[in-house]
């Protein structure tokens, strides 16, 4: 199986493209969804509360606020949760070893050095205006957190430069499908 990492800035369209690929029958893995599942585990909640006692109670909103305003807390949480995420990613790859392609959306792929787990990386990108417009439609939108996320992520330009492929999601659906089909055709040549 070719393992393809999908990354990009906040609200760039990564999940939309991952879900589109899943609808087309490709095997997919979403880091954000996986982490949300991990957070349901009481042992993991307890571990996070021991690691970050200032939280007092396990609350996703509190965690977000803390990690985007406290570099040390973010680093502690990442050091705790990333090995668990890597286990789940490796399990996904093993379970789908006979598939031609496996696509995994990892928002902080380069920042967390997850690129080593992939044969190819795709960066999904669009203009800042479109990203902000998309972000504001989310129920959890907070402009301060949006700006903090931008600060800790590599720039969109850096992610595009590092990637093997780039998809501009700031286009109409027909053009987006064409780009995804071109990506698949390119990957087919590399199997």
From Swiss-Prot:
Matching InterPro entries: Depp_CoAkinase (IPR001977), P-loop_NTPase (IPR027417)
GO MF annotation: an example: ATP binding
Residues annotated as binding ATP: 11-16
Enzyme class at the top of the EC tree: transferase
Domain of life where this protein originates: Bacteria
PROSITE patterns, sorted: DPCK
Single GO cellular component term: cytoplasm
Reactions it catalyzes: 3'-dephospho-CoA + ATP = ADP + CoA + H(+)
Keyword list, A-Z: ATP-binding, Coenzyme A biosynthesis, Cytoplasm, Kinase, Nucleotide-binding, Transferase
Compartment(s): Cytoplasm
Domain (DPCK) ranges: 3-191
Similarity comment: Belongs to the CoaE family.
Function according to Swiss-Prot or TrEMBL: Catalyzes the phosphorylation of the 3'-hydroxyl group of dephosphocoenzyme A to form coenzyme A.
Name of the molecule in the record: Dephospho-CoA kinase
Organism: Rickettsia bellii (strain RML369-C)
